[in-house]
Regions:
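Structured, solvent-exposed acidic/aromatic patches
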Residues: 1-174
């Protein structure tokens, strides 16, 4: 294009404007993506639930004290109009927006927390930790291994209903 630099220069968006844009994009993606995988060959294709999960994380970050009314950013202003890049007023509704997206994911009934059954290696927990059966307590599961195995790859892929970040196995060790 032959447009001038001035015509191609736009003021930087605020953090809240960026979050709104990203959330809108994830909403649109969730509408276009399937709610379930049609076959094992499509394991690399994200589902609508994955898009909503990412949207919820973005909204949770925006609701956090780091970006929601944090006075640390008081001097971060757009030079064209003096608007703060980071909103200086705490907004509790940001938490509600994030929670609403999380609730939509829960209400699909398609997802569950990954757990590893308790066994002889499961540690004994302090008295202040409920031993009621999961999800009301730690009864019947090994919370440490349940969390740890999500990151170590210890769980066989055949037992996992959805991969959010997947990579084909490579046995080429050279």
């Amino acid at each position: 294009s032959n447009a001038s630099v001035e015509d191609m220069t736009y003021p930087r968006a605020t953090y809240d404007e960026c979050i709104a844009f990203i959330a809108k994009e994830y909403e649109e993606a969730a509408q276009m993506l399937d709610t379930e995988r049609s076959s094992i060959e499509t394991y690399k294709v994200p589902t609508a639930g994955a898009a909503l999960a990412l949207e919820s994380r973005v909204l949770l970050e925006a609701a956090s004290p780091w970006f929601n009314g944090n006075k640390y950013y008081v001097d971060f202003k757009r030079h064209t109009d003096g608007v703060h890049y980071f909103n200086q007023t705490y907004d509790a509704t940001k938490w509600a927006k994030a929670a609403a997206v999380c609730k939509r994911i829960i209400d699909t009934g398609k997802y569950a927390l990954y757990t590893v059954p308790a066994d002889s290696k499961t540690p004994t927990f302090p008295a202040n930790v409920s031993t009621a059966n999961f999800p009301d307590g730690v009864g019947g599961i090994d919370p440490f291994r349940s969390y740890n195995d999500m990151f170590t790859g210890e769980e066989s892929g055949f037992n996992v209903s959805e991969f959010m970040w997947a990579k084909e196995a490579s046995w080429d060790l050279v």
